[in-house]
Amino acid sequence: MAVIKSALELALERTKNLQVDESLQKASEAKLEGRKAASRWLEEPESVDFKALAGAIPPEHRQTFLRAAFEVLSTQVQLPLNTGIDKAKLEAAGKAIIVLCGLSSRFGSEREAKLAQQQVQSLFQQILQFLGQYSEEMKRAEQAIRNQWAPKLKEKERQLAAQLGQNVRIDPMSDPEFAEFYRKNIDAMRKNYANALEEAKNQLAALCGFATNE
């Protein structure tokens, strides 16, 4: 025999669902505010007070706010597409991450938070050095690839010159064989650096209590 729920039971279930929905909405709002705050910081750091903004978020959603801000800032920490890095923007992101770390609910005391901030600052400096090293290594690798390919390219130019009866210059990147060789070597190098950088960013998140599994 089917159990017929009372009006009170049904009302309580609806209330429970409403409470869950409201909690999810508050969490979503906290995440959005965190992202907006981090974006503003990158444009105009002096206009953002993370401590005050976090204080305005309900305590149960404060960590969501901080994690969302951290995620936006950490996207600035990436391998440059060209050989240069935007050091000023990276340093601004690092400064904000240190502030966010100090506000994390992971720490039971101010002393613990300060220690974590020091560790984050040290790790971020290592990341900056790593990115600078990457830029230099990419320049050297590109030059080494061009030097290695130069004899083949000169031979192709010589053959074309003999056919056309005039001197010929070939842009290395317009040569499919060279382009494939270049891409394969540069992509492999970039992948190694990208993996190492991702690991360092995960360490940053873990130090602050912003890892996705926390």
Predicted regions, residues:
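Long amphipathic alpha-helical segments with strong coiled-coil/leucine-zipper propensity
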Residues: 38-142
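Leu/Val/Ala/Ile-rich N-terminal alpha-helices, chiefly Sec-type signal peptides and the beginnings
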Residues: 1-63
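Long amphipathic all-alpha helical oligomerization modules
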Residues: 143-214
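Intrinsic-disorder-associated interaction segments
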Residues: 1-4, 27-31, 43, 58-59, ...
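Alpha-helical context
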Residues: 6, 14-17, 29, 106-110, ...
